[in-house]
From Swiss-Prot:
ATP binds at residues 6-13, 119. This is tRNA-specific 2-thiouridylase MnmA. GO terms for molecular function: ATP binding; tRNA binding; tRNA-uridine 2-sulfurtransferase activity. GO terms for cellular component: cytoplasm. SUPFAM superfamilies: Adenine nucleotide alpha hydrolases-like. It catalyses: S-sulfanyl-L-cysteinyl-[protein] + uridine(34) in tRNA + AH2 + ATP = 2-thiouridine(34) in tRNA + L-cysteinyl-[protein] + A + AMP + diphosphate + H(+).
Length: 356
């Protein structure tokens, strides 16, 4: 099988390339320029040359594709718009759905590949594409690195052409295997949380790149009592305690962002609860009539799965309503809610639109 392997130059993607090569497939190493030099000084010709050298040394053909304009349109601009609307977006999940398994996968097909492999820590069954087959997405075997949450928005037909060689590996074993083989990744450091934001400082990035962000407004309790002023809703996240600048009899937390009033609603730890959330843009990987009675959700990446009741809304097939089995810390609107069964199979994923 001809498989394109998405390579960034890091440990995980280089190991994925090695695994696919050693399995005997025809391989093209596919490197995407998602960021232009205007977005980051780290995207340089030197890095690309180093990545190409490493890939060719392993015996793979190498191809570079400039997708920076599309990345700005499909990932960066929606990221900025979400903050303008008082939401906390998840650009990595959007990138997986629209870029890595969207436009980059399209590039792979144009190069003659039947599948695209990446360095994600997640599993697919079956593990190799088979014509006409549907696939199921599962949590990776390394609980500390599992990335199925970020993949829950990738459509079924895209996953059907994907390969995840790292799904059954743990990160420390990946590093050890490369070291044993004497293979040094050209960009060996861990990738930052959001690739287009230097130092993961989203506030500095938005200040420099986003016009029209909402300004200061009142900070209020649930009863409407004003206890202070915030510096712009985009600078806060639900559940946040630090940085509120309020002297109160007990610690206060961000309960919600009232965009209509440009008000930041705060309250005590006891008030920091939610019964559920409503999601839009739902990507269904397993038909709901095939779901087990017991399902679970994750509304944050490093969160343990929590029991919930999940049902499609009556107003459309791409929405769903999530009711937590027990009161839960409010998730942030704009984040992903991924639905699982008890064994770790991903059933669906959607964008949190509102919390109640």
């Amino acid at each position: 099988m001809h498989i394109a392997v998405a390579v960034s130059g890091g440990t995980d993607s280089l190991f994925a390339l090695l695994q696919v090569l050693e399995a005997g497939h025809q391989v093209t190493a596919l490197h995407a320029h998602f960021l232009s030099p205007h977005d980051t000084p780290e995207t340089t010709a030197h890095n690309t040359q180093a990545i190409e050298k490493a890939c060719r040394a392993l015996g793979a053909d190498f191809h570079v594709e400039d997708l920076s304009a599309a990345f700005r349109k499909h990932v960066i601009e929606p990221f900025i718009d979400a903050y303008r609307q008082g939401r906390t977006p998840n650009p990595c999940a959007r990138c997986n759905a629209s870029m890595k398994f969207g436009l980059l996968a399209d590039t792979a097909r144009k190069l003659g590949a039947q599948a695209i492999a990446t360095g994600h820590y997640a599993r697919l069954q079956p593990d190799l594409p088979r014509p006409g087959n549907t696939v199921s997405l599962w949590r990776g075997d390394d609980p500390a690195k599992d990335q199925s949450y970020f993949l829950s928005l990738v459509p079924q037909h895209r996953l059907a052409c994907a390969v995840f060689p790292l799904g059954g590996w743990r990160k420390q074993d990946v590093r050890a295997h490369l070291k044993q083989r004497g293979i040094v990744p050209p960009l060996p450091s861990e990738s930052q949380e959001i690739c287009f934001i230097p130092g993961d400082d989203y506030r500095a990035y938005l200040t420099a790149h986003a016009a029209g962000l909402p300004g200061a407004g009142p900070m209020v309790l649930r009863d409407g009592h004003v206890v202070g002023h915030h510096n712009g809703l985009w600078q806060y996240t639900e559940g946040q305690r630090r940085g509120l600048g309020i002297a109160w009899s007990e610690p206060l937390y961000v309960l919600e962002k009232d965009v209509s009033r440009n008000a930041l609603v705060v309250g005590t730890r006891k008030q920091l609860t939610a019964r559920g959330c409503r999601c839009v843009g739902v990507n269904t990987l397993v038909p709901p009539d095939q779901w087990p009675d017991a399902v679970y959700v994750k509304t944050r990446y490093r969160q343990t799965m929590i029991a919930a009741q999940v049902t499609p809304d009556a107003d459309g097939a791409d929405t769903m309503r999530v009711i937590f089995a027990a009161s839960h810390t409010p998730p942030a609107a704009g984040q992903v809610a991924a639905v699982y069964d008890a064994a770790g199979r991903v059933l669906a994923g959607g964008i949190i639109a509102s919390v109640f």
